[in-house]
From Swiss-Prot:
The keyword Cell inner membrane does not apply. A lipid is attached at residue 109 (GPI-anchor amidated glycine). It comes from Mus musculus (Mouse). It is found in: Cell membrane. This is Lymphocyte antigen 6C1. Residues 110-131 form a propeptide. It comes from the Eukaryota. The lineage of its organism: Eukaryota, Metazoa, Chordata, Craniata, Vertebrata. Its main location: membrane. Disulfide bonds join 29-53, 32-41, 46-74, 78-95, 96-101.
Amino acid sequence: MDTSHTTKSCVLILLVALLCAERAQGLQCYECYGVPIETSCPAVTCRASDGFCIAQNIELIEDSQRRKLKTRQCLSFCPAGVPIRDPNIRERTSCCSEDLCNAAVPTAGSTWTMAGVLLFSLSSVVLQTLL
């Protein structure tokens, strides 16, 4: 009976250690910036402070031509936004917090302003520069 209790305790401790070790490795997200929509983005391990994977798709309409770009990255926050008022720009951003969850923007994703997108992109660059 004492051996059974010891075995169960060891299994429980091992399970907790494995769960903690997996999270200590950090969230994994896809990462690329302003690339054509069909481009594959590599997977990266985020910093411990980054708890969200961000997926952003932008469609620019210039002279009746459409360009579709995407950004994928790790961030420490999920950016909030305001609807875009420019009819030549369509943008969708989503955030999630599971490994490699930012492969695509969900169809029901939120709409953000270009100003909000630029602000969060700029802030991530500034943070990376400072760190």
